[in-house]
Amino acid sequence: MSGFQFKQFFIAHDCCAMKVNTDGILLGSIADPSNARHILDLGTGTGLIAIMLAQRTASAQITALELEENAFHQAQENAQRCPWNNRIDVLQADIMTWKSTKKFDLIVSNPPYFEHSLASRNKQRDLARAVTYSHFDWLKQSQQWLTPNGRISFILPCDAGKKLLEQSHLLGLYCIEYWEICTKVGLSPKRVILTFSPQYAEMALHTLTIYDENQRYTADFTQFTEIFYLKVNSK
């Protein structure tokens, strides 16, 4: 069974098109679950982000949705094997048709991001990476499940993130936090983490760099991830 060993849990990903990656680890580390009683993870994949948020909270109940069948079963197995399995519910569902009367205090997603991708020979990987619905559609769906003071956090490529930021006002949502993620010191950002809320607040801007000039994890990256990684070497 191939996968990734964290300090307190193991994520198997041999049946998933999208493997454990830095995007998921960043969102699971940075999204703010403070005071969240109910958390929703859209397109959970391996279940990584849901499990990370379970570790970071004392009692939050987490619902994780996944459409692709193989990934759904693997996310279920990963969640059942982790120390917080009594607080994670993995469901096979399409976010565009899923119905829920429950409202969530925090909604997170590392959504598909190739809006105009070329099809590969791996249909499972295509489903995981290619956007069937726009990121605006994902945000609109998320809004209906959000509590009045809740937050929605997405990680996206920079261009897609900027586009969604411009569109969010159409839903009456405010971007209250914006993280630029740089792979290495001196390089332009490759990813952004955006947090939206129906409540206005001045947008907080942050930058996080993963590697320093010596290819070691930066102190900032280490601070966010050290509770998860077995070994994190900072400067």
Swiss-Prot record:
<dbReference type="GO" id="GO:0005737">
    <property type="term" value="C:cytoplasm"/>
</dbReference>
<keyword id="KW-0963">Cytoplasm</keyword>
<comment type="function">
    <text>Specifically methylates the adenine in position 37 of tRNA(1)(Val) (anticodon cmo5UAC).</text>
</comment>
<dbReference type="GO" id="GO:0016430">
    <property type="term" value="F:tRNA (adenine-N6)-methyltransferase activity"/>
</dbReference>
<dbReference type="InterPro" id="IPR007848">
    <property type="entry name" value="Small_mtfrase_dom"/>
</dbReference>
<dbReference type="GO" id="GO:0008033">
    <property type="term" value="P:tRNA processing"/>
</dbReference>
<dbReference type="Pfam" id="PF05175">
    <property type="entry name" value="MTS"/>
</dbReference>
<dbReference type="GO" id="GO:0032259">
    <property type="term" value="P:methylation"/>
</dbReference>
<dbReference type="InterPro" id="IPR029063">
    <property type="entry name" value="SAM-dependent_MTases_sf"/>
</dbReference>
<keyword id="KW-0808">Transferase</keyword>
<protein>
    <recommendedName>
        <fullName>tRNA1(Val) (adenine(37)-N6)-methyltransferase</fullName>
        <ecNumber>2.1.1.223</ecNumber>
    </recommendedName>
</protein>
<keyword id="KW-0819">tRNA processing</keyword>
<dbReference type="InterPro" id="IPR002052">
    <property type="entry name" value="DNA_methylase_N6_adenine_CS"/>
</dbReference>
<dbReference type="GO" id="GO:0003676">
    <property type="term" value="F:nucleic acid binding"/>
</dbReference>
<comment type="similarity">
    <text>Belongs to the methyltransferase superfamily. tRNA (adenine-N(6)-)-methyltransferase family.</text>
</comment>
<dbReference type="InterPro" id="IPR022882">
    <property type="entry name" value="tRNA_adenine-N6_MeTrfase"/>
</dbReference>
<dbReference type="InterPro" id="IPR050210">
    <property type="entry name" value="tRNA_Adenine-N(6)_MTase"/>
</dbReference>
<keyword id="KW-0489">Methyltransferase</keyword>
<keyword id="KW-0949">S-adenosyl-L-methionine</keyword>
